[in-house]
C-alpha cells in the first residue's frame, strides 16, 4: 500500500518549488509523482498536422521524487507523515500527528 496516492494534497518540502501545495495527478512506478501546477518545465514541440498538434513551447508538469514531498494535513495546516492502522480487518492510512484517517 502506498503512502501517497492519486488525488492526495501534498506540500513540496525540498527543491525549487518548496512550500507550494498541489494535488497528485499521477503516481509513477519509480517513486515519482506528477503534481498539478508544480515543477513546471517547458517542452519545445514540433507541429504535427496529422494529429492536429500545434507546435511551440508548451509548459507541463514534470515528475517529482516522493522524498521531496509530504502529505498535507488540512486539520493542522502542516506537512505530516503517514502511518497505517488496521480497523475492522482493513488497512487504512492515518496521519501520524492526529491518528485520523487520511481519506476522511
UniProtKB/Swiss-Prot annotation:
Keyword Transferase attached: no
Keywords: Ribonucleoprotein, Ribosomal protein, RNA-binding, rRNA-binding
GO cellular component terms attached to this protein's record: ribonucleoprotein complex; ribosome
GO MF annotation, one: structural constituent of ribosome
UniProt xrefs under Gene3D superfamilies: 2.30.30.30
Entry annotated with the keyword rRNA-binding: yes
PANTHER family xref list: MITOCHONDRIAL RIBOSOMAL PROTEIN L24
Family, per entry: Belongs to the universal ribosomal protein uL24 family.
Name of the molecule in the record: Large ribosomal subunit protein uL24
Amino acid at each position: 500500500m502506498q503512502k501517497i496516492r492519486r488525488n492526495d494534497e501534498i506540500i513540496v518540502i525540498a527543491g525549487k518549488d518548496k512550500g507550494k501545495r498541489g494535488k497528485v495527478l499521477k503516481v509513477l512506478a519509480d517513486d515519482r509523482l506528477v503534481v498539478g501546477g508544480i515543477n513546471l518545465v517547458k517542452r519545445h514541440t514540433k507541429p504535427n498536422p496529422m494529429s492536429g498538434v500545434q507546435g511551440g513551447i508548451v509548459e507541463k508538469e514534470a515528475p517529482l521524487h516522493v522524498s521531496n514531498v509530504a502529505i498535507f494535513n488540512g486539520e493542522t495546516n502542516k506537512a505530516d507523515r503517514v502511518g497505517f492502522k488496521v480497523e475492522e480487518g482493513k488497512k487504512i492510512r492515518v496521519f501520524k500527528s492526529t491518528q485520523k484517517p487520511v481519506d476522511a
